[in-house]
């Protein structure tokens, strides 16, 4: 079930005009040799996937996506989804869908293709290429939307070093600082495990150790959702019993 404030962001989002006004001066100040193009997009919550980002990528292109906004299931009850879960991407028509773990993300294209964006909830994916498994009319039940900036860096740009340098200037927009922090301090997924693709990547689970030094997985979630999985080569036969326990600290 959708949980209250799924995005985990307690602050109020900017509107689309404020979003652009905050980021445009920063974009104008970037050296011309760094970026090969950018575009702003507004994704209304009522728009079913997919939205054409208008950018054709080639293998090796680095792209940064910054987003803000909320898609509401119920405004009176303050039930909404933020960009960390709501904003999905796809390169080309048939490649696997993916999302970031926060309201900001940077990724490298693995193949040529047009970049597409999607406001996901209340939909569910029918397959990994982003075909919907829910009726289109479900999108009429939500409101709000997402403001998105897509920025493509020139080939050869060291994006990690670039954001590290950008973070030294506290005058840059908050979303830029947030992406610098995410790049500089990523949350690793436990080795041999992966997030279930239908819900997307996350920062919920991380490798850890028990008090006596045994390998463990730490689970910490706030306004997020995700399922971790791995292959278990165990034959399921009559009599096979699976058991597990949960611990929740507040």
Give the residues covered by each predicted segment:
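Gly-Asp-aromatic-enriched flexible segments
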Residues: 2-212, 216-250
């Amino acid at each position: 079930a959708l949980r209250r404030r799924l995005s985990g962001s307690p602050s109020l989002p900017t509107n689309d005009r404020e979003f652009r006004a905050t980021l445009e001066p920063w974009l104008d100040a970037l050296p011309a040799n760094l970026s090969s193009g950018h575009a702003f997009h507004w994704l209304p919550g009522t728009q079913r996937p997919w939205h054409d980002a208008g950018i054709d990528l080639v293998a090796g292109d680095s792209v940064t996506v910054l987003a803000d906004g909320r898609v509401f299931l119920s405004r009176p009850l303050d039930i909404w989804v933020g960009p960390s879960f709501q904003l999905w991407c796809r390169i080309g028509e048939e490649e696997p869908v993916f999302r970031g773990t926060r309201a900001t993300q940077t990724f490298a294209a693995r193949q040529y293709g047009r970049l597409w964006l999607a406001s996901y909830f209340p939909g569910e994916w029918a397959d990994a290429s982003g075909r919907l498994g829910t009726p289109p009319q479900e999108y009429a039940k939500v409101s709000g939307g997402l403001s998105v900036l897509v920025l493509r860096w020139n080939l050869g740009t060291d994006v990690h070093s670039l954001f590290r340098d950008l973070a030294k200037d506290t005058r840059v927009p908050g979303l830029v600082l947030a992406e610098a922090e995410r790049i500089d301090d990523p949350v690793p997924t436990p080795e041999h495990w992966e997030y279930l693709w239908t819900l997307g990547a996350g920062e919920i689970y991380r490798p850890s150790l028990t008090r006596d030094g045994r390998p463990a997985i730490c689970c910490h979630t706030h306004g997020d959702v995700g399922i971790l999985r791995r292959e278990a080569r165990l034959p399921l036969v009559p009599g096979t019993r699976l058991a597990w326990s949960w611990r929740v600290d507040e």
